Amino acid sequence: MDTKLQLRTYRRWDGLTADAVALLTSPREDPLAIPLLVSPSTAHARAVGQAVAVEVGVAAGLQGRTASALRRELSQSLLDMDPQVDPWSGSALTLRIFDLLRPDDPDMAAVSEHVQTCRVRGIAHADWTTAQQFSAVLQSLIRHSPAVLEQWRAGEDVDAEGSALPWDKTWWPHVWRLLHDDGHPDPMTQLTQLCSALGAAPLRWPSCVWISPAAPEWQDYSLAQALS
């Protein structure tokens, strides 16, 4: 893959599309090697593909991928990870959290008190609801504040501003650390491993066009850098 990273910003979609088409249809040593197109959505990729077809008559083999889909594809091929099994998202993460909410764990005092209060009030399944809510919190932190999670892993139980967590949230870092006991590398570790593997692996794409919003997520930025 061409290792020259060029960053371009656009205010208009037509200007972006014109440049993307020029890059995707430029001459290459192996005409059968299809460039990689990464876009925010399948709709964006389809629009670029249609523009390529208008320019050269056909867009055969050009299949756009979102950044998350590319991460899954590369993780499967380079790290042998099953893209259908993600212990750090959805119901899988909720279930793992639920299994850790033990009433005899002193670090779970806030959760135990909440669940007991709900039972007295006749509210069922408060522990499962709590697991669902914390699963959503973790997935948001993974996307937007991975540094906080790294601090928790290191034993620094603080919020995004570096302040101590309130009592009702002191169990959050405890559960985050417990989630690592089953050996599943967290998303930050997975991405580090993937980026390292990319540095040593031959890739089938001769070049890459990566269309990103103005403020890409950190995972997307790191992967784009690793591909450059």
Feature roles, as predicted:
Residues 23, 29-32:
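An N-terminal domain-cap segment
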Residues 16-19, 190-194, 222:
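Well-ordered alpha-helical segments embedded in enzymatic catalytic cores
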Residues 31-44, 208-213:
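Conserved RecA-like ASCE P-loop NTPase motor core of nucleic-acid helicases/translocases
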Residues 1-24:
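N- or domain-start disorder-to-order transition segments that initiate the globular core
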Residues 4, 34, 58-61:
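A generic structural signal for alpha->beta connector loops
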Residues 9-15, 183-187, 212-214:
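Short, flexible loop segments at the rims of nucleotide/cofactor-binding pockets, characterized by
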